Amino acid sequence: MTTLSPKDVVIVDGVRTAMGKSKNGMFRNVRADSMSAELVRALVKRNDFDTNEVEDIIWGCVNQTLEQGMNIGRNIGLLADIPKTAGGQTVNRLCGSSMQALHTAAAQIMTNQGDVFIIGGVEHMGHVGMMHGIDINPEASKHYAKASNMMGLTAEMLGRMNGITREQQDEFGYESHRRAWAATQAGRFDNEIIGIEGHDAEGRLQLCTVDEVIRPDTSMESLAKLRPVFDPANGTVTAATSSALSDGASAMLVMSAQKAKDLGLKPRARIRSMAIAGCDAAIMGYGPVPATQKALKRAGLTVEDMQTIELNEAFAAQGLSVLKALNLLDKRDIINVNGGAIALGHPLGCSGARITVTLLNAMEQMDTEIGLATMCIGLGQGISTVIERV
């Protein structure tokens, strides 16, 4: 384990909601800002610290309208009874929004612009559709391929470029569900999931503590029967090898190492490096490759040094293409060990902090020291974070 410097950015804790189905799911009657506020309250209670120390609440959210509008980051702080002296902001880097929230807080800590931050993200894709209110510039097709706005087609492109077969994708999707359900049954999500009240299929109030999107009965045989959904004539990407539409929130408590010591809080990890990178919008799923290469270089590490990895599974074709480019195809046993977004869902603004929290818990369960969280971002970006247990 590493020795901390006073200005090291440390992760004290991280939590998330269970992931709910967006269509008639368990959070169908729960607002995005309400579930986020519940999560923040639970994070504060679990760590028992003086919230007057909070500099800012930084929340990732992609479609910032309706219940997710009017600076949801600030609204969450007020709903969660965080002192009004703390600020609140909402950030949008599409799929990487809540990982960007983490990066923003880390940068402020590193530059003496605050010591304690609550970060996280949310997306209620059942209440606020992914394309709600979106008006793409008609001239955009002069600058990048029109299909770049259709995430499934970008996955098809990556799959063809990298020779990813339909069977490989089906196996990847099957394994995501298998691992996620095994993790659920073994209690490996218990430390990260905070129960939020929702409703069962009959409308009865229930405490939601199990990811609703996982399909325990998934089999290779059932996946093989599905038709391609984005390119019906020639495609290989199906609904089962795409991340599910879902509702959920995630949150983390981050601060300087010195402030954690002053408050008597034990850090779980420190941030070693962070990076953003762009790529062609038509192959947006490739973004984790250059972002990870940057982050590793900044940390003075190589991909071989990574002991546990969380890669957001936007699509199986995309995930496998990234693993191929990073020479990680033969290291699947350390990647998404508890399943990924194909099984758990991908609530856009939630996912960045969610995979970082899941990574940290997996590292503790496997007793590894160095880990990587990385994800692709629509319109051609990638974001990566390297963390080290302390």
UniProtKB/Swiss-Prot annotation:
It is an enzyme of class 2 (transferase). One of its GO terms (molecular function) is acetyl-CoA C-acyltransferase activity. Keywords: Acyltransferase, Cytoplasm, Fatty acid metabolism, Lipid degradation, Lipid metabolism, Transferase. Its main location: cytoplasm. PROSITE patterns: THIOLASE_1, THIOLASE_2, THIOLASE_3. Pathway: Lipid metabolism; fatty acid beta-oxidation. It comes from the Bacteria. It catalyses: an acyl-CoA + acetyl-CoA = a 3-oxoacyl-CoA + CoA. It is found in: Cytoplasm. One of its GO terms (biological process) is fatty acid beta-oxidation. The keyword Transmembrane does not apply. InterPro entries: FadA, Thiolase, Thiolase-like, Thiolase-like_sf_Thiolase, Thiolase_acyl_enz_int_AS, Thiolase_AS, Thiolase_C, Thiolase_CS. The active site is at 95 (acyl-thioester intermediate), 346 (proton acceptor), 376 (proton acceptor). NCBIfam families: AcCoA-C-Actrans, fadA, PRK08947.1. Belongs to the thiolase-like superfamily. Thiolase family. Heterotetramer of two alpha chains (FadB) and two beta chains (FadA). PANTHER family: 3-KETOACYL-COA THIOLASE FADA, 3-KETOACYL-COA THIOLASE, PEROXISOMAL. Catalyzes the final step of fatty acid oxidation in which acetyl-CoA is released and the CoA ester of a fatty acid two carbons shorter is formed. This is 3-ketoacyl-CoA thiolase.
